[in-house]
Curated annotation (Swiss-Prot):
Keywords: DNA damage, DNA repair, Hydrolase. HAMAP family: 3MGH. It is an enzyme of class 3 (hydrolase). This is Putative 3-methyladenine DNA glycosylase. It comes from Staphylococcus saprophyticus subsp. saprophyticus (strain ATCC 15305 / DSM 20229 / NCIMB 8711 / NCTC 7292 / S-41). GO terms for molecular function: alkylbase DNA N-glycosylase activity; DNA binding. Pfam families: Pur_DNA_glyco (PF02245). PANTHER family: DNA-3-METHYLADENINE GLYCOSYLASE. Its EC number is 3.2.2.-. One of its GO terms (biological process) is base-excision repair. NCBIfam families: 3mg. Belongs to the DNA glycosylase MPG family.
Length: 203
């Protein structure tokens, strides 16, 4: 996947349906990305790189596109894929996954099952048993990979405001969150809006 020659919003949309794979010492976990959020760098008041902020904790965000930026928020590990050229702190937060392989162990890792398994940015990383030390490593060069060949394609993509970023002016409501419409593994999904997962993808 091209993380350098396309804008971050385009990448965030294109990641929907991409197969994500993590190999730990015991198990391979896989699933399909169903929810992303784009963060647009120095001008984005909700972004970690807003105004060029650069600390050791966010240093990975300034690396070349295709780098993994892993950070902890409220004890939850969040995984972002860095986009753009080195020095431009833009990226895509992977918010939710439709699980595929390793579901039984995911349920043990999470202490949950069903749609609660992976329907949030800290939930799927716990289900997949992803460690923080992936921060700064390159996607597809270690244990965390994406597969763009054996992927799915959403029937419909919805755009909405990002979650959990109040008081950021216009950036609070900008439609930079992208979801596979109706997929039940999306975070904060109303039951009345849920469809069976197979009906949310193009055949």
């Amino acid at each position: 996947m091209d993380f350098l020659q396309r804008d971050t919003v385009t990448i965030a949309k294109d990641l929907l349906g991409v197969r994500i794979i993590y190999h730990d010492e015991l198990q391979t976990f896989t699933g399909y990305i169903v929810e992303t959020e784009a963060y647009i760098g120095t001008k984005d008041r909700a972004a970690h790189g807003y105004n060029g902020k650069r600390t050791p904790k966010v240093e990975s965000l300034y690396k070349q596109g295709g780098t993994i930026y892993a950070h902890v928020m409220h004890t939850h590990l969040l995984i972002n894929f860095v986009t753009q050229l080195e020095g431009q702190p833009e990226g895509v937060l992977i918010r939710a996954i439709e699980p595929e392989e390793g579901i039984e162990l995911m349920a043990i890792n999470r202490g949950k099952n069903g749609f609660e398994l992976t329907n949030g940015p800290g939930k799927w990383t716990k289900a997949f048993n992803i460690p923080r030390h992936l921060d700064g490593s390159k996607l597809n060069e270690g244990r965390l990979k994406i597969d763009t060949k054996n992927r799915k394609y959403p029937k419909e993509i919805e755009a909405s405001g990002r979650i959990g970023i109040p008081n950021k002016g216009e950036w609070t409501h900008k439609p930079l969150r992208f979801t596979v419409k109706g997929n039940p593994y999306i975070s904060r999904m109303k039951k009345s809006d849920m469809r069976q997962p197979e009906y949310t993808w193009r055949i």
